[in-house]
Amino acid sequence: DFCRWYQENCGQNPAWHTNMIAEIKAWLSDKQISYAYFHTEKIDTNRLPAMYELVKDLTEDLVKKYQQGNFLYLPPIDRTVGKNGRMPVWICWWQGISEAPELVQKCVARMEKMFGDKADIRIITFDNYRQYIAFSETVAEKFNKGCISMTHLSDILRAQLLCRYGGLWIDATYYIWDDRFIDALCQFPFFTQKQGGELNELDIVSGRWANNFMKGPAGFPLFGFMVEAFELFWGKYDEVLNYFLFDYIIAVCYEQLPEIRMIMGACPVNNRFSQVLADWGNEACDPHKLELLTADTWLFKLTYKKQFSMQTSDGQRTYYAALLEEE
């Protein structure tokens, strides 16, 4: 699989990153993984909201740099990450998991159980983030002034962690159903939760990626592009002009850099019903429906902003209860 090949041939070798795209494309070709088979269509960018054009214009020179193969390389700060070939898994809860809502604690405990010794899980907090990354003076200053929220600071953190170390970033409110995720994560160079479906100019993502569940090797150009695009944005603006800034940055990289798009496209559609239980969590569990859901989906996105119950008002087991019973 890709994870083993990467560890044996590439690792943290800076020289390898200069030829990363060619190496990954060769690996995909050798494994006979077709780009065309997967969901790689482009949206008609002429119909996208103005935010896309703003980010595209802002990153015009950056896109040209990446088109020439001049990718960002950020060396690791903590060289113990991923030791013994284990994949880094990044989870962030700024105040620490002990201070997190109960649902978050349950989700993270489930991740730790399911990954076991197969991954190097790192939980990032305000107390330890400097051990792994370094925010620029611009970002630090604008965060301290209140221009950058904790949510958008975590976006910048995510980009840096993935660029420096690679591995998987997973939102703390994802619940892993079973161990199918191990094969899925290691089978492809880039992996993300990808619902697929029809392209929609009103939805910049259109099921092509999920920025809260992304895995790839250290130095993967998408991650470097994200780091540099955030710096460009916050160097110019003092407020987030659109909540989905992160996705617009990914979209520009996806649309403007065909080789990155092909590698992202090699990740198959997966976990199509990932969002369902956030809506159905308090409904009475239909075992047949649950079986159909989990035949397709092993990753469920929940929310701590909603109160989930173990039983309905008439005493029936809920979908949320069914999830927790898997523990």
Predicted regions and their residues:
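Glycosyltransferase-associated regions of secretory-pathway enzymes
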Residues: D1-S154, A172-E327
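Small-residue hinge/turn detector
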Residues: D155-Y165
